[in-house]
Curated annotation (Swiss-Prot):
Gene name tied to this protein: SPIN1
GO terms of molecular function: DNA binding; mRNA binding; RNA binding
Origin organism lineage: Eukaryota, Viridiplantae, Streptophyta, Embryophyta, Tracheophyta
Residue ranges, compositional bias (Low complexity): 81-95
Induction of expression: Circadian-regulated, with a peak in expression in the middle of the day under long day conditions, and from the middle of the day until night under short day conditions.
Native species: Oryza sativa subsp. japonica
Name of the protein this chain belongs to: KH domain-containing protein SPIN1
Boundaries of every KH domain copy: 139-205
Compartments, record wording: Nucleus
Length: 281
C-alpha cells in the first residue's frame, strides 16, 4: 500500500479556486489513505472496535463521493459532517464460534440496514460503497504432508507472522479445525462443545475480509495468494521463511532473558509466548 499512501496529503485541505484539481482524484487519494489505515488497524480491530467501525463508515462515505461525478455533488459531500449511518455489530448474529464448516464465500451486508439507505441529506449511497464481509475457507493439506508444521509456519513467534499477514492484507485470518489447538488433550476436551464445533473438521484457514464491495474481491484474492504461498511445504534446507522466524524467536528469547527478573522463568511457549491467538474461538 506504500505506493497508494501519500504522507503529504491532508483530507482537511481546502481546494483553491485557482487550482484545477480533479475532486474525484483528490477523494480517491483520500480513500487510498483510509484503506491504508484500515490495513494498519487490522491486528487491533478486536481491541479497538469503535475505531474500526468509524473508519469503515468513513470508507463508505468517501467511496460514495468518489463514485459521484461533478463539482456539485463533490462540494455537497465535501463540506458536511459524515452521515450518521448505523452499523450493526458484525458479530452479533454469530452463534458459538460464528463459523460453520463450509467451502466458498459467505457475504454479509453491513452499514446500510433497511430503512437507512439514504444519507442524512437524502443522497443514496453508491452500491459499490457498501462495506461487505466475505469469508473464504482454505483447506490445509495435512493429509499430503502430515509432518509439516503448517500452524507454526502461519503463526510464527508469538503469532507475529500471522499479525504481519493480517496487517499487510487488511484481512483477518483464523486457524480452525483438528490440530488448531496446541494442546491435544485440551482439544479433545473441547471438541463438540458449543463454540468448538470446528474441531471436528479437518485443519483449515478462514480468511475474513471487510471492505467496500468494489474492492473486497481483489483484497480477498490477495490474502488468499499470501496464505496459499505459506501453505506450500518447503524443504527445510531451503526454507528462508522459517529461518527468519527462528532468528526472530531467538531475538525475542534474548530480550525476554534480559528483561526478566528471574532468568529462565519466561518461555516463548507460556501465556506471553507462542500463543495460538487465532484458534479455538
Amino acid at each position: 500500500m506504500s505506493g497508494l499512501y501519500s504522507p503529504g496529503f491532508s483530507p482537511a485541505r481546502n481546494l483553491s479556486p485557482q487550482i484545477r484539481s480533479n475532486p474525484t482524484d483528490v477523494d480517491s487519494q483520500y480513500l487510498a489513505e483510509l484503506l491504508a489505515e484500515h490495513q494498519k488497524l487490522g491486528p487491533f480491530m478486536q481491541v479497538l472496535p469503535i475505531c474500526s467501525k468509524l473508519l469503515s463508515q468513513e470508507i463508505m462515505r468517501v467511496s460514495s463521493i468518489v463514485h459521484n461525478h461533478g463539482f456539485g455533488d463533490f462540494d455537497r459531500h465535501r463540506f458536511r459532517s459524515p452521515s450518521p449511518m448505523s452499523s450493526p455489530n458484525p458479530r452479533s448474529n454469530r452463534s458459538g464460534n460464528g463459523f460453520s464448516p463450509w467451502n466458498g464465500l459467505h457475504q454479509e451486508r453491513l452499514g446500510f440496514p433497511q430503512g437507512t439507505s439514504m444519507d442524512w441529506q437524502g443522497a443514496p449511497p453508491s452500491p459499490s460503497s457498501h462495506v461487505v464481509k466475505k469469508i473464504l475457507r482454505l483447506d490445509v493439506p495435512v493429509d499430503s504432508y502430515p509432518n509439516f508444521n503448517f500452524v507454526g509456519r502461519i503463526l510464527g513467534p508469538r503469532g507475529n507472522s500471522l499479525k504481519r499477514v493480517e496487517a499487510s492484507t487488511g484481512c483477518r485470518v483464523f486457524i480452525r479445525g483438528k490440530g488448531s489447538i496446541k494442546d491435544p488433550g485440551k482439544e479433545d476436551k473441547l471438541r463438540g462443545k458449543p463454540g468448538y464445533e470446528h474441531l471436528s473438521d479437518p485443519l483449515h484457514i478462514l480468511i475474513e475480509a471487510e471492505f467496500p464491495a468494489s474492492i473486497i474481491d481483489a483484497r480477498l484474492r490477495h490474502a488468499q495468494e499470501v496464505i496459499e504461498e505459506l501453505l506450500k511445504p518447503v524443504d527445510e534446507s531451503q526454507d528462508f521463511y522459517k529461518r527468519q522466524q527462528l532468528r526472530e524467536l531467538a531475538m525475542l528469547n534474548s530480550t525476554l532473558r534480559e528483561d526478566s527478573p528471574h532468568p529462565g522463568s519466561v518461555s516463548p511457549f507460556s501465556n506471553g509466548g507462542m500463543k495460538r491467538a487465532k484458534t479455538g474461538q
